Amino acid sequence: MNSPPKVSVLITVTGVDQPGVTATLFEVLSGHGVELLNVEQVVIRHRLTLGVLVCCPADVADGPALRHDVEAAIRKVGLDVSIERSDDVPIIREPSTHTIFVLGRPITAAAFGAVAREVAALGVNIDLIRGVSDYPVIGLELRVSVPPGADGALRTALNRVSSEEHVDVAVEDYTLERRAKRLIVFDVDSTLVQGEVIEMLAAKAGAEGQVAAITDAAMRGELDFAQSLQQRVATLAGLPATVIDEVAGQLELMPGARTTLRTLRRLGYACGVVSGGFRRIIEPLAEELMLDYVAANELEIVDGTLTGRVVGPIIDRAGKATALREFAQRAGVPMAQTVAVGDGANDIDMLAAAGLGIAFNAKPALREVADASLSHPYLDTVLFLLGVTRGEIEAADAIDGEVRRVEIPPE
């Protein structure tokens, strides 16, 4: 004998959240022999929305008992419920194709509305929206299904929204590889630390103006990095080598840097830095932060004095990408599972080589080639692009007694 055809029933519960709502609903449903297809729940400011999709024979869905029992049980606990029947029994769809992150301080309704309009105009369906952060920025994640061939248009449209609405909007493929990153490498100057180390050294020689002009031109991609490095280092000739330790002691981490590295270590990432700066200045910080890999330039020192030259291979644009590949090989990590974070034109090749390249408060030349761009001066925003939420960060910190929020001045 053929079993009677089945239909689907969507039950939506809304109201003030309280313990036991889900248990109450499923206790009733179990008495009617329904089969569970899907459950989704969200709670915002203690307001619950619970959706339960079930299938059952048509006579159960159409009869009065199921509706009566569900409504009576839910209203008894003070919540509202709606019940919708459909002849279709839906098949669970393929997962979303992309994820979109929107980060801002603040995210205005106008900004999010602009994102939603561009998404809709391209026929992109929003499958899920969730909050990922309330500090140091507001962060939202949208999982979406993008029609074939619309990927490029989506990225272009959302880049425009990002610029016009002053929010960060990043689009990533929603694939298994997104969850499998294992090695992350940071640039140092203006990324891991605030400011430029070469300018701090130049200040000791009274050449900060000259060096700053050369640095700016190099970071905009207007000068060959190797030549600009040699010109800048030449201004340091004659300085005592003790200035290296002085400058190393003056380095200030980018806000959120410790949180970022602490969290990444908990997740099992290998972490490194690749810098066009100088190894002797960076190494003490790298040791303090327990970094696994360091690549940087070497200042020549003769008789305790800087000669104004570098020795060994120069870590330039190509050298940074080479260092990333070497780190990945040493760590046994495929390049698809690497992340690179930087801010200047000399980071272009490194970000292009990485599985995920993130431009951090970057020059236009780098933003154009990066997979994602961040414009807020908090390094821990990188974690959100890796799928880590602020709640997860602080829950892990709480175990070690490290939860701390610093007041952020208005932008």
Swiss-Prot record:
Give EC number(s), comma-separated: 3.1.3.3
Q: List GO molecular-function terms, semicolon-separated.
A: L-phosphoserine phosphatase activity; magnesium ion binding
Record's Pfam families? ACT_6, ACT_PSP_2, HAD
Could you tell me the Gene Ontology terms of the biological process aspect for this record? Answer: L-serine biosynthetic process
Pathway noted in the entry: Amino-acid biosynthesis; L-serine biosynthesis; L-serine from 3-phospho-D-glycerate: step 3/3
Q: Where does Mg(2+) bind?
A: 187, 189, 343
Which family does the record claim for this protein? Answer: Belongs to the HAD-like hydrolase superfamily. SerB family.
Protein name, UniProt field: Phosphoserine phosphatase
Whose protein is this, by species?
Mycobacterium avium (strain 104)
Q: From which lineage does this chain's organism come?
A: Bacteria, Bacillati, Actinomycetota, Actinomycetes, Mycobacteriales
Q: Which gene encodes it?
A: serB
